[in-house]
């Protein structure tokens, strides 16, 4: 970095000058309030259609919700994005970006630069793409994106977008802790020019903006966009889409749109953007796509001869790409391994060992001792019946001529088959003669198979999202830039789109960014290591785990969730673990808030002491040799995040909980079901109905918890960190000196519940009430999940409801529970037709279907689950689980064998008889009848207080089964005497009921 850092305006000018030299048009920012540079027509509209375009411009961007009254070091409601669009994307896209950093004084060797997975999406305008956040020593400074769709339209030509966060970059270059201290030019700071405006606009955005006016603006702008489109004017129409989007952002900042209502607004804007995109492409096509005259030519790929491999050798395939998302690398490793093994097995190719290695820039398949030949054994292919191939006189039929010609055979008569036994054979199948073609044994070179199959294998790999980057027709997780395919020391010529294989790989992007010649597969790992790439993921994990352990000592431990360790393994090619610190004053913030900032946002490992208290030391896994610059940069990256968290938390503590509750009235839950205040009122009704059934905790505690459980939804912290909903509510209740049990319950009621979760009784009851209300709400509104889509997590919530009822040992029939609580919903709902009966039937079936998952998780055998989950079983989760436990305890014992065999015998006998169901038993005539009746009465008396789910009930049922079997052996049920017959049938009907709802024939 130069000794004299650039001012903000000089820095922006340098970047624009760099891109101008690359052929970009220098545009100006748009003259409307846009939330990001992507909204500028130079991006949104120019990305559509096939026309090439290269531009760079500085976009003033408005995000009302990000305002911090001019007090935050880098959060602004109005800031600048320097946007670059390259269409089509050049192959050296990432390299060009890194070169642009050099022109503003960044020496890349001194910094830890990461390309961190970013599936960028702007749902408001139906735009999405795949790429990265670029982190400079832990601070996000740029977004790089390969656009895949704009205006909900897949793109004909891919655009590459670079979005520089110019304020953040300037802060780093000038070593400023606050954006307001950044020198705009040699005499004025950023604060001199913008800070007062930030204060004024924050006050307007959050406090005084007229929500009625903005609601009307939104509707008016949306209507005008449609009207303008109808007149065939997509450009003016798009301006009104931008205006509608800004109106939505204003309403969002005022907190009058709930999480659920946001979807409706966003959907409306997205539909408008799609309509504009459609009309724009049609309009440009009518003009003949005038910019197509400048489209560049595409590269060509030349086929090469397959080398002859004469002995078994090691094989290497390296798929070199731009940085893969960390979560995609293990997926790629698993797939490449399984697909390669299947390929070799399908072709009967032997080998000694196979492994797949992966880093952000490469997936490498290494096969040791790969056989150079495979033998395809002789095989037969069934053909048509001879009667279709030959006429009666033996001559070849017209169909036969076509068949033989298609297989390159010269057969003129039926008799010729006898001289062609090595090619054709006749076999009789069920009296009909068929022709079989003989495919002789063949020795095939493995190299030829690999050349043909490997491109198909790579194309077949699946990732959560795949992308295109040119018109080569290839989709992959990120652009493929090189292929290494070595069989021994010979290059196998494979091609994928415009990329052809060779023996050239690449070293570490920062530590040793040079081409590497790989002489053979055996030398691959060592050559990569010499170029600072540790290609083995196991070795990188070991380095990270050891580094975390070495830097924590005896009195502290790293908070190191498995997902973060794995992510850092696949974010690095040569990991180093370093320690940094933050201001210890921040340790007074809620632990969960600190962890969310460090782990979720920064991929840092927090540390805590042996008492579980957060310390001010944190650990960083970087991908460059540690320097003071890297440590200082990461500390500076974290400080604004903690400052923001502290600002929001302190702001919330100054607001009373009752003020939060009052504000819930203005936040929509579901448009058709009113506000969050309406939901809270409904939860109170649910509680009054449910508490007699589930008196799990003191009433005053659950009353308090229900009243305040949604209060933190309108807090500043939860608005910024939605994942902390409920957790922050706990802190706010504690701050208000309310019931400790209620505070804990609020903190627990939104956490994911599993069989191993520890939840307080008050928290469990609150969680039950909330989940039942959510389920009923969605089913009433028809928001049912599909096989692939469950946006409201109804499956998970159903599982959690059943789990809570079981873990609290609450004996509740869910049909009864739902039928009681559905009465608390309005019978008439706008734009919704519903009936309680229909909702209850669908909801009970849906929730009950999840119980099988819980039974499986508890380890019950399939036959046990089938025995208890029957059509007529009670809809009581606790009863069913206890029943399964009792059955499983007695499985493979004489008890169950006796019960099952007797029940099945009884069921078969009753099915064979014709009778009217009755339990009335009159005077019994025979001693056998009397004895059996007495056994039945003893059973009923013994089980009066026993639940049918208990082991003791089943043991009593065993005794009754033995008495039943003895009775059936001793008498003839279908006695000639009608009275005796009816009495015995009545006895059996009464006995059958004692076997309960169980499916005994499943055992």
Curated annotation (Swiss-Prot):
Q: Where is this region: Glycine--tRNA ligase beta subunit?
A: 311-1003
Keyword entries, A-Z: Aminoacyl-tRNA synthetase, ATP-binding, Cytoplasm, Ligase, Nucleotide-binding, Protein biosynthesis
- Its top-level enzyme class, in one word, is ligase
Q: Does the keyword Oxidoreductase apply?
A: no
The domain of life is Bacteria
Task: Name the Enzyme Commission number(s) assigned to this protein.
Answer: 6.1.1.14
Its chief place of residence is: cytoplasm
Locate the region Glycine--tRNA ligase alpha subunit: 1-310
Which cellular component, as a GO term, is one annotated location? cytosol
Q: Does the keyword Nucleotide-binding apply?
A: yes
Cellular compartments annotated: Cytoplasm
Reactions catalysed: tRNA(Gly) + glycine + ATP = glycyl-tRNA(Gly) + AMP + diphosphate
Q: Please provide an example of a Pfam family that matches this protein in its UniProt record.
A: DALR_1
Q: Which GO terms describe its molecular function?
A: arginine-tRNA ligase activity; ATP binding; glycine-tRNA ligase activity; protein dimerization activity
Supply one GO BP term: glycyl-tRNA aminoacylation
**By its UniProt entry, which HAMAP family does this protein fall under?**
Gly_tRNA_synth_alpha (MF_00254), Gly_tRNA_synth_beta (MF_00255)
- Please report which protein family the annotation says this sequence is part of: Belongs to the class-II aminoacyl-tRNA synthetase family.
Q: Which NCBIfam families match?
A: glyQ, glyS, PRK09348.1, PRK14908.1
Protein name listed in UniProt? Glycine--tRNA ligase
Organism from which the protein derives: Chlamydia muridarum (strain MoPn / Nigg)
Cite the source lineage: Bacteria, Pseudomonadati, Chlamydiota, Chlamydiia, Chlamydiales
Could you tell me the gene encoding this protein? glyQS
């Amino acid at each position: 970095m130069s000794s004299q850092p650039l001012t903000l305006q000089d820095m922006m000018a340098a970047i624009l000058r760099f891109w101008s030299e690359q052929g970009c048009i220098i545009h100006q920012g748009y003259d409307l309030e846009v939330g990001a540079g992507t909204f500028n027509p130079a991006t949104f509209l120019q990305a559509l259609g096939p026309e090439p375009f290269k531009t760079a411009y500085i976009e003033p961007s408005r995000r009302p919700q990000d305002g911090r009254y001019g007090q935050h070091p880098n959060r602004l409601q109005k800031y600048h994005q320097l946007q670059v669009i390259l269409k089509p994307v050049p192959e050296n896209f990432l390299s060009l970006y890194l070169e642009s950093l050099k022109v503003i004084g960044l020496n890349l060797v001194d910094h830890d630069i990461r390309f961190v997975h970013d599936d960028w999406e702007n749902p408001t305008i139906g735009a999405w793409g795949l790429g990265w956040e670029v982190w400079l020593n832990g601070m996000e400074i740029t977004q790089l994106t390969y656009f895949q769709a704009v205006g909900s339209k897949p793109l004909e030509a891919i655009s590459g977008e670079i979005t520089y966060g110019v304020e953040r970059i300037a802060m780093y270059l000038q070593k400023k802790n606050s954006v307001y201290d950044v020198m705009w030019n040699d005499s004025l700071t950023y604060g001199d020019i913008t800070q007062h405006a930030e204060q004024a606009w924050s006050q307007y955005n959050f406090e005084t903006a007229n929500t009625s006016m903005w609601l009307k603006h939104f509707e008016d702008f949306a209507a005008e966009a449609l009207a303008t489109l109808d007149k065939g004017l997509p450009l003016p129409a798009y301006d009104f889409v931008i205006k509608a989007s800004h109106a939505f952002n204003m309403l969002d900042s005022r907190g009058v749109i709930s999480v659920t209502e946001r979807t409706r607004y966003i959907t409306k804007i997205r539909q408008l953007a799609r309509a504009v995109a459609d009309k724009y492409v049609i309009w440009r096509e009518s003009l003949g796509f005038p910019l197509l005259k400048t489209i560049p030519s595409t590269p060509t790929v030349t086929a090469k001869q397959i080398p002859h491999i004469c002995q078994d050798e090691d094989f290497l395939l390296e798929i070199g790409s731009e940085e893969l998302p960390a979560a995609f690398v293990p997926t790629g490793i698993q797939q490449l391994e399984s697909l390669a093994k299947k390929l070799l097995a399908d072709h009967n190719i032997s080998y000694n060992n196979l492994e797949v290695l992966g880093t952000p820039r490469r997936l490498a398949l290494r096969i040791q001792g790969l056989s150079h030949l495979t033998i395809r054994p002789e095989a037969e292919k069934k053909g048509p019946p001879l009667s279709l191939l030959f006429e009666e006189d033996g001559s070849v039929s017209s169909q036969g001529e076509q068949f033989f010609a298609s297989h390159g055979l010269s057969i003129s008569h039926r008799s010729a088959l006898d001289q062609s036994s090595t090619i054709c054979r006749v076999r009789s199948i069920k009296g009909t003669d068929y022709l079989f073609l003989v495919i002789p044994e063949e020795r095939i070179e493995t190299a030829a198979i690999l050349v043909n199959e490997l491109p198909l294998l790579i194309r077949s790999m699946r990732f959560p999202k795949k992308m295109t980057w040119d018109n080569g027709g290839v989709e992959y997780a990120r652009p493929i830039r090189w292929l290494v395919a070595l069989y021994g020391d010979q290059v196998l010529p494979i091609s994928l789109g415009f990329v052809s294989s060779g023996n050239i790989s690449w070293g570490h992007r920062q530590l040793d960014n040079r081409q590497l010649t790989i002489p053979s597969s055996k030398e691959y790992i060592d050559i990569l290591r010499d170029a600072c790439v540790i290609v083995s993921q196991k070795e990188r994990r070991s380095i990270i785990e050891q580094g975390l352990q070495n830097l924590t000592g005896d009195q502290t431990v790293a908070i190191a969730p498995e997902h973060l360790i794995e992510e850092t393994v696949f974010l690095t090619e040569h990991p180093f673990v370093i320690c940094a610190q933050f201001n210890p004053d921040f340790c007074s913030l809620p632990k969960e808030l600190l962890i969310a900032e460090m782990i979720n946002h920064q991929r840092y490992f927090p540390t805590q002491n042996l008492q579980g208290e957060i310390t001010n030391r944190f650990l960083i896994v970087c991908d460059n040799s540690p320097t003071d610059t890297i440590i200082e940069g990461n500390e500076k990256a974290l400080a604004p995040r903690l400052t923001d968290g502290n600002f929001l938390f302190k702001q919330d503590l100054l607001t009373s909980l009752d003020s939060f509750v009052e504000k819930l009235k203005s936040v929509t839950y579901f448009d058709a079901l009113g506000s969050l205040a309406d939901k809270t009122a409904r939860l109170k009704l649910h509680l009054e109905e449910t508490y007699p059934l589930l008196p799990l905790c003191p009433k005053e505690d659950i009353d308090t918890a229900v009243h305040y459980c949604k209060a933190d939804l309108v807090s500043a912290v939860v608005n910024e960190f939605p994942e902390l909903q409920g957790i922050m509510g706990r802190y706010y209740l504690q701050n208000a000196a309310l019931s400790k049990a209620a505070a804990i319950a609020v903190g627990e009621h939104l956490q994911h519940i599993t069989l191993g979760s520890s939840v307080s009784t008050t928290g469990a009851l609150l969680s039950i009430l909330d989940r039942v209300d959510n389920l009923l709400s969605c089913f009433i509104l028809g928001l049912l999940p599909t096989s692939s889509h469950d946006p409201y997590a109804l499956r998970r919530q159903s599982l959690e409801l059943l789990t809570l009822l079981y873990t609290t040992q609450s004996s509740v029939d869910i049909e009864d529970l739902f039928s009681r609580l559905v009465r608390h919903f309005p019978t008439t709902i706008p734009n919704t037709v519903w009936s309680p009966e229909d909702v209850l039937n669908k909801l009970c079936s849906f929730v009950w279907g999840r119980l099988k998952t819980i039974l499986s998780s508890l380890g019950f055998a399939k036959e046990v689950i089938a025995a208890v989950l029957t059509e007529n079983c009670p809809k009581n989760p606790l009863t069913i689980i206890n029943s399964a436990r009792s059955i499983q305890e007695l499985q493979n014992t004489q008890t169950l064998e006796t019960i099952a065999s007797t029940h099945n015998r009884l069921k078969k006998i009753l099915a064979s008889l014709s009778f009217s169901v009755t339990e009335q038993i009159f005077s019994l005539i025979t001693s056998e009848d009397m004895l059996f009746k007495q056994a039945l009465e003893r059973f009923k008396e013994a089980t009066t207080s026993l639940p049918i789910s208990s082991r003791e009930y089943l043991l009593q049922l065993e005794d009754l089964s033995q008495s039943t079997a003895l009775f059936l052996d001793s008498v003839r049920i279908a006695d000639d005497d009608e009275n005796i017959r009816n009495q015995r049938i009545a006895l059996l009907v009464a006995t059958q009921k004692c076997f309960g709802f169980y499916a005994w024939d499943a055992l």
